[in-house]
Amino acid sequence: MSGRTILYCLPIAECLFGALATLALFVTPASAEPPKQADARNKPLEVAVFEKLLAKHRDLTYDELTAKLKQRSYLDKLSFDPTQAPSFDLVAKKMQLTKEERGIFARNAFVSIDQNRRHTFASAYYQIYTGDLPVLVTSDSILHAMHRSYDDILLELETTLFTWTIDQILADSHQALAEKASANKDAALAANYRDVDLYLTVARNLLAGAGAPEKATDQPNDVWPGGLLVPSRLEMDKEVLAILKHVQSLKLQFPKRTPPTEIYGGTRYLDYSQFKPRGHYTKTTELKRYFRCLMWLGRIDCGWNVLPTDGTPGIESDSDRELRDAVLLCELLQATGSLKPLKALDDIIAFMIGRSDNLSVFALRNAMKDGNVKALADVKEAKALQRVQTGIRNSKQAQQMIRSQVVISDPDDPYYKVPPPATFQLFGQRFIIDSFVLAHVVFDDIIFKKKKQERMMPRGLDVLAALGNNVAVPLLADDLRKFNYSANLLASREFVDLHKPEFWKANLYNLWLDSLRSLHEDMTEHKRFPETMRTKAWQMKQLQTQLGSWAELRHDTILYAKQSYTAGILCEYPAGYVEPYPEFYGRVKYFAEEAGRRFEAADYSIRNEKLASQLKVIKQHQVSFFKTMAESLSSLQTLAGKELKGEPFTAAEKTFIKKTIDMRGGGSGPPRYDGWYCNLFYRRPECAKWDPIIADVHTDPTNNRCLEVGVGDVNFVVIAIDNDKDRGVYVGPVYSYYEFHQPAEHRLTDQDWQKLISTGKVPARPDWVKVFQAPARERKP
């Protein structure tokens, strides 16, 4: 028995979740045999490119990293006293600025104010409106509207088209399986029928409500007392029930702590805590069930390993058997006519989020075609199976770019990084570039001077640094020096920069990230850019904007994205200014235009007459909404461009800003918000709904914790703007961003997070926001 220590790790870009997890635990190995090296033949091109970039920067230090970064010429001081700017006294009085808030404003010419009230972006705009204050149209507010609309559209599709289609595909495939199994006379293939029966029966039970808590824990109630809701067709009830009980437990299986799951003739450790519904999936019982079902159909460790794992520690599988399982499922999908609706559904998810980071049904079918294989019976013999395996290897579409299950890595072996297995899933998790970044700035990807660095938890700042925000890098200095991952961070940035415009336009997720990238464009040399916005403090505020929007993006895609494990009222604002980022508004406009085109072209056909009629109306609403959104963004882009050119606004453009928001009396009912800002919300009547969100984006089981990122109450920014010789003070709404550690067994839902905010129990904001953020005010009753 060797005395060395092995580090179990899951740099889990968790398949359907908001939690890229690098899971680690020290244990004693059973054998001192050196691990086999990864098969380079299976590596995706992206991984090979990243590794070359990483090798180029081997052993890079933090000081060497910062020396390579382009430095900006930030303004050290302003040419005017912001407290003497016209309208400051009015704004200070109306906003009741505290001594500390005045101090930060005097120093930076802007300050972020937390009134400790349950403000939304719409209600914040309305407070500015009712206070007769000059309005600042913020990038934060535009991004938040984009989040709300994206999330609502996804939810709408899930509760109509997606749920019905998946239910039908599973039911049809299960029936066909039973028929084929009864006709099978080959005992050697019986295990494959049982494996696929297990896979389908678990999925159907989860969609029917199995796996829910035994007792009601929150609203809406979703309870499962036990027992199968859909029976196995091949006497696999016991095995199915065992997995459903694991799902109900929400426990993380881990070496030396728990036994693994016996599945598909082998064993593996599954993180069942990831089956806890989060994001918008807690809103209805049906969504909770859909969440669990898609988790099963998407998590890599629930799928089939289709190429040999070469004895990868932590995984025991028969890849020949599991590849036959996948071939059988493809055969069933073909026989039942399920490929067309499956492809239509996959295409919608692909243009909203991205492509699968695993072997998909369609990629496997291509390999089967190349190997002259149509059915399970065709791969009974080893030679036929090998032809399919060769096709899979040649396609390089099976090897994951982000590892997503429990494996074991030796911290003392600097030459071996555990490769992610080649895995098949029906609705596999999607590759997203920010998860790729997070997966490469943690153990076991960091090697410095021939020693693996045990950095178990990434930070949101890693993503922004890789996306090109230089302000984020010094904020990571402590981590970079302690864990020596400067080479990984620089390689990640260069990897991101290598992607051509087509990549950023490939899907709505990438378009969203690309919009965020435009907010750290260097405008310090632009003489018409407001002096206040040419300071480092302002760029820190924009960093918060980016992180807040990124948290909303990860929240919205938590199930699909692969993650690394309100008075004397005037009816207008007296004056207004738009944050002068024309490129940002242009990219969001393109997001809206492209979304409109993609949704119009999407296949919503369904074998349900009532739903088909409903989906026709839904599509018309989606296309019309994005057209209106694009028109508003076009106006903002024009206004921002004019500000930078020093051109005056037309009367119509002035009216546009003044009509950002309004609120009409509701008579005996509630008031109704109005204005172009409300038109940016897919569900317009809910534009002022209070909805702070939270998402766990990384898990560290060694310390039993996860990393949570979220946004809280909307804050106000008070800012002095010099627009040529015209100076004024404006007020606008901005994000409040939170990032903190939470016990892994208590991952937060939006409802949990909102309760913490309402009771004043939120954790501290990141230290770096203190540059522009005043302390939260006392809560007023």
Language-model features, listed with the residues they occupy:
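N-terminal secretory signal peptides that target proteins for export/translocation
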Residues: 1-10
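Short intrinsically disordered, low-complexity coil segments enriched in acidic
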Residues: 2-3, 25, 314-315
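Bacterial N-terminal signal peptides
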Residues: 10-26
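Boundary at the C-terminal end of the N-terminal hydrophobic targeting segment
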Residues: 30-32
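Long, non-catalytic protein-protein interaction scaffolds
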Residues: 34-781
